[in-house]
C-alpha cells in the first residue's frame, strides 16, 4: 500500500480486512452526469461501475456486500448501478442502513438478497424534477416512461407488484407537502 493511501486509510479510520467479499458503500446522494458540490456527500456512478466490473472479474472475490444509506439522486446513474448489480454472476447482498430513499429502492432490490435494519427507512415517491419545462406534454411522457423504468425494475427484482408500488408512490396521506410513502424496516418488508 502506498504511503499516501495508507495515511488516507488511517485518517478515515478504515481497517482493511483480508476477505473474499467485496464491500461497496453507496452513501449520500447518487451523483450522475451533473457534478454535486464538494461539500455534498455523494456516490459517483463513474467510480461504482468500474469497481463492480473489477469485482465481477476478480477470481479472488466470491461475493458482494452493498451497504446503503442514500437519500437518492440521479435516476439514470442509480438505474445503471442497479442494473449492473442485478446482472452480476457473483452473489450480492444489500443492507439498508439509515435510508434507501428514492433511487435507493432499485439499488436495494438489485441484489440477490436485500436486507433492511428495523430503524432504516425507504421513501417511495413519483419521479421528480426541477427547472423549467418547455414542452409540458412531452416532458410528462418522458417522466412517465422514466417512472415506468423504475417501477418495472423494482417489481422485477422484488416481491411487490408494479401496481402496489405505484399505489405507494402516489399516496397523498403519508408525506407532508408531498406524494409518496415512507416505510421503516419492518414495513418495507411487509409492504412488498
Where are these regions (language model features)?
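Terminal-region recognition feature
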Residues: 1-192
